[in-house]
Amino acid sequence: MTVSQLLKQRVRYAPYLSKVRRAEELLPLFKHGQYIGWSGFTGVGAPKVIPTALADHVEKNGLQGQLAFNLFVGASAGPEENRWADLDMILRRAPHQVGKPIARAINDGRIKFFDKHLSMFPQDLTYGYYTRERTDGKILDYAIVEATAIKEDGSIVLGPSVGGSPEFMSAADKLIVEVNTATPSFEGLHDIDMPVLPPHRVPYPYTRVDERSGLDAVPVDPARVVALVESTERDKVGPNTPSDEGSRAIAGHLVEFFENEVRHGRLPANLLPLQSGIGNIANAVIEGLAGASFRNLTVWTEVLQDSFLDLFENGSLEFATATSIRLTEAGFEKFFANWDEYSSKLCLRSQVVSNSPEMIRRLGVIAMNTPVEVDIYAHANSTNVSGSRMLNGLGGSADFLRNAKLSIMHAPSARPSKTDPTGISTIVPMASHVDQTEHDLDVLVTDQGLADLRGLCPRERAREIIRQCAHPDYKPILTDYLDRAEHYAQRSRSMHEPHILQQALRFHTHLAEKGTMKVPSWD
């Protein structure tokens, strides 16, 4: 087939050009039940052409449920995986996902989903943990990877994310590479650590966020590359959720806390490397830092959003490491227009490194993440609404919160239910599901205030969380529960972490029955 000039410019390893194919030619390679790995992380850098061709094939031929795969991605992919979910093309999925169609399929029981710490997932895959039932010795049948260039030695230059691609490519029997010529090449932006199996590992050699190993592309055996496909479609990232009054209040509490930590010598003047999640609260926090007096900041995180570009522009941010650059269309335009400025201050690593407990603890990262709910003793639920309904997955929150120097969670104090504008309290007597334990959390922040939990016993934590973080509609209800629990615990000599198990989940049962967590009485 004819190879475009753009593709020839991007592919500098000539033997690959003879493997260029149209996506439709590759459809016979795919069989029901295969194990597939995709590149991509938080909706960018995922393959587009092959997944779309497969979805078109299934839809056209009525093969829903008859051509389906065990799909592994570093975190969430793009809209293609949601289309696969709608067409019943996913048998099993891990470790993180975003999108109503795929979440609906998981909660309907049509997709077997499991979430896992993002630092552990790719390496556990290379151990063969997720393919134990296979008898052919393979781990993945195919890795489908989006590249933005191919070097002279055949190594693969990834795009705006690294994620689990190095592990997927090393574990796959065969590779299919989508070379995206619609987006500029990201060559020079990556720093790749290839997987090494125990017991032959050595410590990661990084002691600063800007240090690199020097490998800027993923090495592969060219014989395992069965096809190249040209992709001409850019990533589609929707607009960021704007900050609101509540998220700006949270940001204000955090900035004030950081300033106080600096004054008392517990943090340096430029803080420590920052990790921040996705969403309007995360954006508001970054906006708050951009407007504060902190300079020479550094970032060691999973995902960079548009708000980080503002930190670069005003001179506050010195260097950032991530595994994904998740920018809006306008953000990517700004990024490419100022490539020299941004690329010299940025490094993309694999999620195994960006989320590495070793690195997070060594660098003393300040971790900030948003939970579903937190209970009065500081156990946090990040995944399952009312204990059962999966949202997105654990992601990297526990990687960071367990190992950070400062572990912070932020959330609105209350959220609306269908019938009550403050019908769901973020602070509950007992979390309906626990992802992060009371031992992992240092600071909790809501729009109401900030609770510093360091060094407090459980009963002290409970009083501080209710006083500082609970919504006014829930403070008396939570205080009444805690008073009763302490009275009950005194009689049973169990005062360390008082609970009344018959009542501890009443917020959740009352929400299910009445549409609000505002229980009228504990009697």
Curated annotation (Swiss-Prot):
Q: Can you name one GO molecular function term for this protein?
A: acetate CoA-transferase activity
Tell me which residues bind CoA: 277-281, 392, 396
Which residues does the Swiss-Prot or TrEMBL record annotate as the active site?
A: 302
The record's catalysed reaction(s) read: acetyl-CoA + H2O = acetate + CoA + H(+)
Instruction: List localization entries.
Output: Cytoplasm
Taxonomy, superkingdom: Eukaryota
Q: Which residues form a coiled coil?
A: none
Gene Ontology biological process terms in this record: acetate metabolic process
Task: List the InterPro entries.
Answer: AcetylCoA_hyd_C, AcetylCoA_hyd_C_sf, ActCoA_hydro, ActCoA_hydro_N, NagB/RpiA_transferase-like
* Entry keywords, A to Z: Cytoplasm, Hydrolase
Where mainly located? cytoplasm
Q: What class of enzyme is it?
A: hydrolase
Which Gene3D superfamilies does the UniProt record give? 4-hydroxybutyrate coenzyme like domains, Acetyl-CoA hydrolase/transferase C-terminal domain, Glutaconate Coenzyme A-transferase
> What is any one of the record's Gene Ontology cellular component terms?
mitochondrion
Name the Enzyme Commission number(s) assigned to this protein: 3.1.2.1
Q: Which Pfam families match?
A: AcetylCoA_hyd_C, AcetylCoA_hydro
Entry keyword annotation includes Hydrolase: yes
* Family that this chain belongs to: Belongs to the acetyl-CoA hydrolase/transferase family.
- Which PANTHER family does this chain map to? ACETYL-COA HYDROLASE
Described function: Presumably involved in regulating the intracellular acetyl-CoA pool for fatty acid and cholesterol synthesis and fatty acid oxidation.
What protein name applies here?
Acetyl-CoA hydrolase
